[in-house]
Amino acid sequence: MPIHIGSSIPLMVEKMLTEMVKPSKHIPQQTLNLSTLDNDPYNEVIYKACYVFKAKNVADDDNRPEALLREALSDLLGYYYPLSGSLKRQESDRKLQLSCGGDGGGVPFTVATANVELSSLKNLENIDSDTALNFLPVLHVDIDGYRPFALQVTKFECGGFILGMAMSHAMCDGYGEGHIMCALTDLAGGKKKPMVTPIWERERLVGKPEDDQPPFVPGDDTAASPYLPTDDWVTEKITIRADSIRRLKEATLKEYDFSNETITTFEVIGAYLWKSRVKALNLDRDGVTVLGLSVGIRNVVDPPLPDGYYGNAYIDMYVPLTAREVEEFTISDIVKLIKEAKRNAHDKDYLQEELANTEKIIKMNLTIKGKKDGLFCLTDWRNIGIFGSMDFGWDEPVNIVPVVPSETARTVNMFMRPSRLESDMVGGVQIVVTLPRIAMVKFKEEMEALE
């Protein structure tokens, strides 16, 4: 169905071709096991992102980014060959296995055209997820096995294009995805090999469950909101300028002397978001709300994981408080709790306990039960795809737009870099937020107060 977006011309996207791109060199047939963190059922979701590239500044008769990217993908799979395989969760132990190599396999690569210019879509700034899906490859988790990676190139009338990526989170985290996408554009730009050599080594993050310890499942039966359940959800991208972040940090330091510790944007804005979300949802004040944080553990592993390790290398830390406490605590109080959670994540013994706990969750097929109204997770996407230049002839992407599963988006706030076209937003952040429509009104009031 045509979609009208910022133009009198309805948007129509025609997907012309999908082919299976295979590695440029022969890969022996093999079966690979994944780490405990990769096997976490909460990681078996498909994350997608749109990389928006403007047209070249000069006319070019050979304006075919899809040809360069298709060849680069084949070369990439010679290094990242597991991406060309197939994932399947085994019934026997509920672990994922990756089958790759041989004559089968490949990565779905789609070429599409759009009948409008990128400017009519404002380079996807504040685009809704349903529209963004037009520029993304189709990829789903399937109990019978599925491809973990797919790409789509959508060309626009202006000469610009969108590189759409879909990836199973079981294969990699944001760090790994960033390296993969930069390696792809490096190869498309003429480099002979990726700057960082990929390494599998998933056995380095495998836990050993202790039978006498019951598993901990986060976020069970949290505080209730009068606005949930609902089918009326909205997603907004909230802009927070550098001056607002600076003022909030200064106010936080006046509340509490953090001595030689640096307080980060993620910490102070995360604390402010939690307080704002609790108010917006009008959570039961005596009920528990849980803040979830993704904390990297690459350097906690002994020895540290090499740069080329692209599997999941983070653990989720949880800070539980009653809704009343979140409202009454100062920003500095919450920042202290966030810092404590991050310190715990960097403890080697804690990491082993977390791996053992996750192994039990997998084995027992446990999921979060009860209300999730008070569950609130933060994730930082500011460095997704930013591990080097992505310029392979069309300059750097002017915008990177994540598209996450709707069920996940309802409990997660994503930190994003502002669009490169917004010069007045240098040093600021954008927060992608999904809330019930009635709660979003109050949430935006709280965020406007920050400005």
From Swiss-Prot:
Effect of disrupting the coding gene: Impaired disinapoyl spermidine conjugates accumulation in seeds.
Catalysed reactions, as listed in the record: 2 (E)-sinapoyl-CoA + spermidine = N(1),N(8)-bis[(E)-sinapoyl]-spermidine + 2 CoA + 2 H(+)
Coiled-coil region list: none
Active site as annotated: 169, 391
Gene3D superfamilies hit by this protein: Chloramphenicol acetyltransferase-like domain (3.30.559.10)
Binding locations of spermidine: 47, 169, 294, 316, 378
Organ and tissue specificity: Predominantly expressed in siliques, especially in seeds around the embryo, and, at low levels, in flowers. Barely detectable in stems, leaves, and roots.
Keyword Acyltransferase: yes
Role of this protein: Spermidine sinapoyl-CoA acyltransferase that mediates the accumulation of disinapoyl spermidine conjugates in seeds. Catalyzes the two conjugating steps required for the biosynthesis of N1,N8-disipanoyl-spermidine. Can also use putrescine as an acyl acceptor to convert it into monosinapoyl-putrescine.
PANTHER family: ACYL TRANSFERASE 4, SPERMIDINE SINAPOYL-COA ACYLTRANSFERASE
Self-association and partners: Monomer.
Protein name in the entry: Spermidine sinapoyl-CoA acyltransferase
Naturally occurring in which organism (per UniProt): Arabidopsis thaliana
Gene designation per UniProt: SDT
